[in-house]
UniProtKB/Swiss-Prot annotation:
It holds the Pfam family PGK. GO terms for cellular component: cytosol. Pathway: Carbohydrate degradation; glycolysis; pyruvate from D-glyceraldehyde 3-phosphate: step 2/5. It is an enzyme of class 2 (transferase). It comes from Shewanella frigidimarina (strain NCIMB 400). Its EC number is 2.7.2.3. The keyword Nucleotide-binding applies. This is Phosphoglycerate kinase.
Amino acid sequence: MAIINMTDLDLQNKRVLIREDLNVPVSDGVVTSDARLRASLPTIQLALKKGAAVMVMSHLGRPTEGEFNAEYSMQPVVDYLAKALDCPVRLVSDYLDGVDVNVGEVVVFENVRFNVGEGKNDEALSKKMAALCDVYVMDAFGTAHRAQASTHGVGVYAPIACAGPLLSQELDALGKALDNPARPMVAIVGGSKVSTKLTVLESLSTKVDQLVVGGGIANTFIAAAGYKVGKSLYEADLVEEAKRLVANARSRGGDIPVPTDVVVASEFSPTAAATLKSVADVTDSDMIFDIGPDSAEALAKIIEQAGTIVWNGPVGVFEFDQFGEGTKRIAQAIANSKAFSIAGGGDTLAAVDKYNIADKVSYISTGGGAFLEFLEGKELPAVAMLEKRGA
């Protein structure tokens, strides 16, 4: 990829505009989960070290475009960054007509979604943003799949457009996992619906040696194998699609195994009583919430022998401990594996945290939708723009 990297540029006395993904949960004016903010710090610190005047922008939440709403202000992020960087950080509300920023200083722009035209990648807005800087740095993998003014348009018109270290790491890790994977390659795809992950399943099924499905997705495959799923979440209209995916996998010498044992309950609640059953014994009143220990052990063996592991989605309702053993065993197997492993998606990251394996996963992707679209083989607009500007 012919992308210019920020690390290679001379930024001395340059006005540098960095698009980060600082979209974090905020409660009562305080950031409640700082993973994305922590991930952005090295890029901001590097720009300062290189002698730049630093401007940072991001979206936060989903405010009505073009309207200021204090609930979605970047102020809590500014407070956090000032502490973390140990230097004054200013919030700038009106920045489109010019910003006073000195070398060695950091300013944060107010929520980019307060600008009319952000979502539609408006040309006039993009040009105004581009005029603020000498160098534009795209460092927000989490929004790389969206062609918006702050992620795409600004980079088209900026004097120089480059990738920040965080984005570069992400693209390198995903490339390593997908373009030239160590074999055997195993993908674990969980989540509630086949429909939202169908293109991911199709794309991965042509690349991987073993595809593992979990969560509500697995229920549709269980139904496709001819078993009852009771009152479980599944998609009857996609049973034929599931059969086709299994047949395709088998024709290439692989498989998409369905669980042999499952954990069921009669209701979805934190206090629901869990019962272990053979998949053949599921009744009409059962709801499947996890894979059983035999299935988890079989999948763990597959994972432990892998050369590359891609994990997107839990295999059960792990938020409730009685339905978390399957996901826990999968997490342990990934942690114990010598394979190159990459995990992404919100629920997956929550599982990584819950089972304390973050330091055992080779790479944790910060992008939810962008991670999925990369797995689907789709072109990410922000990345395509950077390639064009680097050519």
